[in-house]
Amino acid sequence: MVSLEKMVSFLDRVPSHILVVIDEAYFEFGNKISDEYPDCTKLHYPNVIVLRTFSKAYGLAGLRLGYAIGPEYLIQALTKVKLTFDPNLAAQIAGSAALEDEDFLQKTLDNNSEQMIKLMNAYAELGIKAIPSVANFIALEMKDESMVEYYYENLLKK
């Protein structure tokens, strides 16, 4: 996890003519784990755009709904090159409802945290090193290629 201090230090060193795009697709998961997880939407730089999605924590992946936050001139430039089709009305309503339903989001994040602990413990019992994650996925460190092939083949069968 990158601290707010490190993020600001980085952004302060980027020349203003260089565009910085920050993908915060997993922001809600990181923010649940630590209050120190940086919310880059609160940073105001003339060359920074922050992207967020409803696909992850809100569970609305099929709607292909997200948003960008940044200086007005950058958002206007993005609008000129965006796809012709805006999200449909159902997606817009679902996104609005998702933002208002804080209880659902909290339950989702709590459930993710609980299941993450169970998975980390299960992998530890199997002798597999799982790299801790604040999101809704885990990276596994396999000892060698044969171990990768073994799990790959067995998971395909299930």
Where are these regions (language model features)?
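PLP-dependent aminotransferase class I/II
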Residues: 47-131
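PLP-dependent enzyme catalytic core of the Aspartate aminotransferase-like
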Residues: 5, 157-158
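Active-site pre-lysine segment of PLP-dependent enzymes
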Residues: 1-20, 24-55
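Conserved PLP-binding catalytic core of the aspartate aminotransferase-like
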Residues: 125-155
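Residues at alpha-helix caps and immediate loop-helix transition turns in enzyme cores, especially N-
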Residues: 2-6, 33-36, 62, 91, ...
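Short histidine/acidic/glycine/proline-rich micro-motifs that form metal-
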Residues: 26-28, 84, 139-140
